[in-house]
Amino acid sequence: MTAETALTVANLRKVFVTKHNAVVEAIAGVSLTIARGEVLAILGPSGCGKSSLLRVLAGLDEDYEGTIDWSLRQAPQDRLLGATVFQADSTMPWMTVEKNLRIGLSGLRLSPETIEQRVAENLSLVGLGDFRRAYPHELSGGMRQRVAIARALATHPLLLLMDEPLAALDAQTRIVMQQELTKIWQRTHSTVVYVTHDIAEAVTLADRVLVMTSRPGRIKAIRSVPFGRDRDVFAMRREAAFRELEADLWAMVRDA
C-alpha cells in the first residue's frame, strides 16, 4: 500500500426525506482518507448507512453535505477509473455472459486479443468458464453475481466499490473468491472500498477495517489488519492475531 491519497472525505452528511416528510439522518459527519492501493472494508449494524456511503462515493447520489476530494482523476487507456459491484443483479439479461463482460471493456483501448484474454481469465476466476454463452436467466442468483464481479474485475479499475458482492455465494465459493480477490488486488493495486456484514471477510480482505455506528452512521473506529497483502486466507484464519481482531471488531459492531 502506498501513502499517496486516493480520496479524502470531509464532514459527509446524508439526509433522507421519507414519503411522510420525516427527515432521517443516514450519515453524520464522516471524515476519512483512503490511500491509493488500499483495501478498506466497512462494517456496521444494518441500516447504519454503509450502502448510502458507498453510493455517494460512487457518484450515484449527489444529494449530500460535505466534500469528497478525488485524487484519482484519470486512468490509463487500458483501465477503468472506477467500477462498482452491488448486491442487486446488474447483469444485462439480453446478453450472454461473455457479452456482459465485453460491454464492460468496450470503452477501453484494448486489442481484440487482450479483450479475449480478460474475458476468459475473469470468467475462469469466478468459475464460469463453461458458461460464457449462457444467458443470465439460465444462471442462479449467485452465478449472476459472479458475472457482475468478473465484469468489474476485467476492467482493472483504479477504484473498485463493492457492496456485499459475495453475499449470494455459497460458503465454499465465497472463501475461494476471497483468496482470488486478494491475489488480484495485489497485482492490480486497485483502491477498494468493500462493504460487508461478514467480520471474518473484512479481516481477510482488507488493509484497514472501518466500523460505523448505528444510524446516523458515524465512524466508531478504524482498525489496521496485521497481515501483508500476500496472504493465505486459509492459513491466516488460524492465526491468533486474526481471531483477536475478529473478536474486537465483533464487540464494536455489537455495541455500535
Model-inferred region functions:
Residues L43-P45:
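The feature captures the beta-strand-to-loop junction immediately N-terminal to the Walker
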Residues A58:
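Helix-to-loop junction immediately C-terminal to a conserved catalytic motif
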Residues G66-D78:
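Conserved ABC transporter NBD signature motif
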Residues M95-I103:
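Short coil-to-helix segment of the ABC ATPase nucleotide-binding domain corresponding to the Q-loop/switch region
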Residues R102, E113-F131, K183:
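Conserved ABC ATPase "signature" region
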Residues A134-H137, T155:
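Conserved signature/switch motifs of ABC ATPase nucleotide-binding domains
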Residues L160-D163:
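Catalytic Walker B motif of ABC-type/P-loop ATPase nucleotide-binding domains
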